[in-house]
């Protein structure tokens, strides 16, 4: 299962990177991917994994150092999935050489964001395949737009 999740996550990250390079994914905040993209990137990955029969929850963790946040996914079997952790490479107080794709046990970067953790259901589990998007919610609209760009051109 870990190998399959890693392959799907790796492919999905490469799709996001290609879409950014091609200037097809210009929805904020993706132009600086992976920086600042953990929330929306995790939501999009959750949708893709959901479509591949893998359900996840989103973990929104806070760092005690500076109250910053980071978001990643976790399966019911406690498999950690993170395609944006490397945004912290080179930042003071953070581990060095953070892998671009983390699938498996929590990595040292996740332990930094363990001060307060909120577990949330990704939108895909509330609105399967974004059929019932709340079009008055800007965040949901951006997620839907981004996912459809990826779906139409890369997936």
Locate the predicted segments by residue:
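A structural boundary/capping signal
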Residues: 1-155
């Amino acid at each position: 299962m870990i190998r399959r999740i890693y392959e799907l996550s790796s492919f999905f990250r490469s799709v996001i990177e290609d879409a950014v390079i091609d200037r097809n994914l210009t929805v904020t905040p993706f132009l600086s991917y992976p920086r600042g993209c953990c929330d929306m990137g995790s939501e999009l990955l959750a949708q893709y994994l959901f479509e591949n029969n893998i359900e996840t929850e989103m973990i929104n963790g806070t760092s005690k150092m500076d109250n910053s946040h980071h978001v990643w996914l976790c399966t019911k079997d406690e498999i950690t999935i993170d395609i944006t952790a490397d945004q912290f490479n080179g930042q003071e107080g953070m581990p060095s050489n953070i892998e671009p794709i983390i699938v498996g046990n929590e990595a040292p970067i996740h332990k930094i964001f363990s001060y307060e953790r909120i577990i949330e259901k990704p939108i895909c589990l509330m609105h399967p395949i974004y059929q019932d998007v709340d079009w008055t919610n800007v965040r949901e609209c951006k997620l839907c737009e981004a996912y459809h760009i990826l779906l139409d051109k890369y997936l």
